[in-house]
Amino acid sequence: MTTETRSLYSQLPAIDRLLRDSSFLSLRDTYGHTRVVELLRQMLDEAREVIRGSQTLPAWCENWAQEVDARLTKEAQSALRPVINLTGTVLHTNLGRALQAEAAVEAVAQAMRSPVTLEYDLDDAGRGHRDRALAQLLCRITGAEDACIVNNNAAAVLLMLAATASGKEVVVSRGELVEIGGAFRIPDVMRQAGCTLHEVGTTNRTHANDYRQAVNENTALLMKVHTSNYSIQGFTKAIDEAELVALGKELDVPVVTDLGSGSLVDLSQYGLPKEPMPQELIAAGVSLVSFSGDKLLGGPQAGIIVGKKEMIARLQSHPLKRALRADKMTLAALEATLRLYLHPEALSEKLPTLRLLTRSAEVIQIQAQRLQAPLAAHYGAEFAVQVMPCLSQIGSGSLPVDRLPSAALTFTPHDGRGSHLESLAARWRELPVPVIGRIYDGRLWLDLRCLEDEQRFLEMLLK
């Protein structure tokens, strides 16, 4: 060991001496004596490793208390941190999809603080059914005979197939064999449910006769899968649910549909592209329709199945239903969200998802212009801060080819170096409330479609 190395080792403080320092008293009160000591031992090991490797002391050795505080503060942060979503994707899967309405937040808080009538019937003091209240709401909204709720739409599809078609064939168009995030593929789900997939048609064209020829004595279902996360365009042919239901009645085979994102209102009335609605498919005679709670519906993560009473009864009695059932917080949030749909005139104001999707480009443009000046003053030495038009997307596999005109604040480095954009984006991710944008075409873009709290936004970026 060299003299220089020995000198560096000698500069490392003893743990008991550090703990006697007044700056560590509050740290021990906040994080506990044991955790502070554990971290100091870890940091001493790190410092010795740096000395061995580079013959220097880590920079943080100048202020041990400050480094311990920084590390423990970061460690204590929740894994689910609030962020400001300026990615341009409204229903961002990685950021939790739909924001909940205030009514849903209040309902969840109440369900967490107090015992609730989850499976208790107040009329006869007997055991109730956890889906009953929501089933009544869903039937009122969609016109279905009954409903079933599980923890997400993937679970809904799995339960729907396992309870009604296990050991039998399910006929699906080849152009509808979708894969969603996480490599969740319809063929794989069918295998897991114990079904045999019977593909018909081609990728771009499937006719009624393709389904007819596929039906045999082992056919359990005719299935439609809404291709919500991609679009096949050009020379195409697909039959709709009404035509498939007519064929199913002729052949005595029920029709089920995985609708995916599942909007409960006609989005075209808000100037958005129209998505098929569960109530339309129920009216067409589809036996079961599944859809998500946390996409266009704007509620919590949930899988919702509506349809014919006898079919829903098979789902409710299947062993998988208990494994996949939703908890009381999910049910509370979903009920509160569904009740908003009973008053459609106020929906775009009270439902955050719809409110954000329907913000006009003009309003967002004015907001961007208002925020440009303070940000340009703060970042102008390194970046050109501009207001630019952009296109938002709905996200979570909803309306994949449709974009929403929006406006963004863009940051372009004066020296043109992309590394400066990466550094800026990284700095913003380290803020107490991280600001998440996207880097594209030599700029860092902050799409303001989802920005409602301007004060918090400026507090973060002007730090």
Curated annotation (Swiss-Prot):
It comes from Escherichia coli (strain K12). It catalyses: L-seryl-tRNA(Sec) + selenophosphate + H(+) = L-selenocysteinyl-tRNA(Sec) + phosphate. Converts seryl-tRNA(Sec) to selenocysteinyl-tRNA(Sec) required for selenoprotein biosynthesis. Requires selenophosphate as the selenium-donor molecule. The modification N6-(pyridoxal phosphate)lysine is found at K295. This is L-seryl-tRNA(Sec) selenium transferase. Its EC number is 2.9.1.1. It is an enzyme of class 2 (transferase). PANTHER family: L-SERYL-TRNA(SEC) SELENIUM TRANSFERASE. InterPro entries: PyrdxlP-dep_Trfase (IPR015424), PyrdxlP-dep_Trfase_major (IPR015421), SelA-like (IPR018319), SelA_trans (IPR004534), SelA_trans_N_dom (IPR025862). GO terms for biological process: conversion of seryl-tRNAsec to selenocys-tRNAsec; selenocysteine biosynthetic process; selenocysteine incorporation.
